[in-house]
Amino acid sequence: MKDNRMDFLKANYHAHTWRCQHACDTEREYIEAAIAMGIEIFGFSDHVPCPYTDGYVSGIRMTMQQAPEYVETIRKLEAEYQDQIKIYVGFEAEYVPEFYEEQMRLFRNLGCDYMIMGQHFLGSEQMGPYTGTETEDESRIRTYVDLVIEGMQTGSYAYLAHPDLMNYQGMDSVYDWEMTRLCKEMKELDIPLEINMLGMGEGARHYPAERFWKIAGEVGNKAILGLDAHCVRHIQDVDSYRKCMDCLLYTSDAADDR
């Protein structure tokens, strides 16, 4: 493979593992690919498990019982590769008020390094709705922004993953108002917004959304690139990296180690 190490991101904090049931390849393979691409910092942030009490079994995240083994696996690899790359372990989490305290206890008990917010649902997973589903319902985009702001005000999340996941296709004025509200609050809290490379690489997805990043640029938000890697191939996607870098032209700042 061509050596693209001089033209690729140096740090990534968004990567998944096979435990989420929609990713493949091993953690070791991810790390080896990251080293080959010249990445200096690599964070695993698999989908956080949820403490369901009604017997619901998620098809898109690990179980609570798998979480200790997940962290232990990454910690062993962190020690093994310490002279070649800095490795972190954490979670990507939705802010769901009824699960928040128990998830934070899990986070602390496992000694995780960080957590990023990826607000895939407007509530618990089994209740939905999925924020990436096209909608003209104003209440959904309003609820999305409200949840993100409330969650970020806890101070528990390092950055906001794919902030433009909300697929509102109603009135432009509503979208602009709500996303401006989100961007202003994230700037006030000094929370970086992620330009998502997985969305860029899979052309059928509606994000990264140019209209969102124009708003973020006008507000002056910090931006960070995230691989959102679900397989080794995503770690090698130089084309999507270059396209995502173009989104930075809209923003006035960028987070460290992008």
For the regions a protein language model found, what residue spans apply to each?
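An N-terminally biased module of ancient metal coordination in phosphate/nucleic-acid-related enzymes
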Residues: 1-95, 102, 107, 169-173, ...
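Alpha-helical scaffold elements within enzyme catalytic domains, especially in hydrolases
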Residues: 33-36, 80, 150, 185, ...
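Alpha-helix termination/capping residues and helix-transition junctions
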Residues: 36, 109, 154-157
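Short acidic/polar active-site loop segments enriched in Thr and Asp
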Residues: 40-41, 113, 158
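Hydrophobic alpha-helical segments and helix pairs
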Residues: 88-130
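Domain-core and long-helix interface of multi-subunit machines
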Residues: 116-219
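H/E-rich (His + Asp/Glu) clusters that bind or coordinate divalent metals
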Residues: 199-248
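Conserved small/polar residues in nucleotide/adenosyl-binding loops
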Residues: 250-257
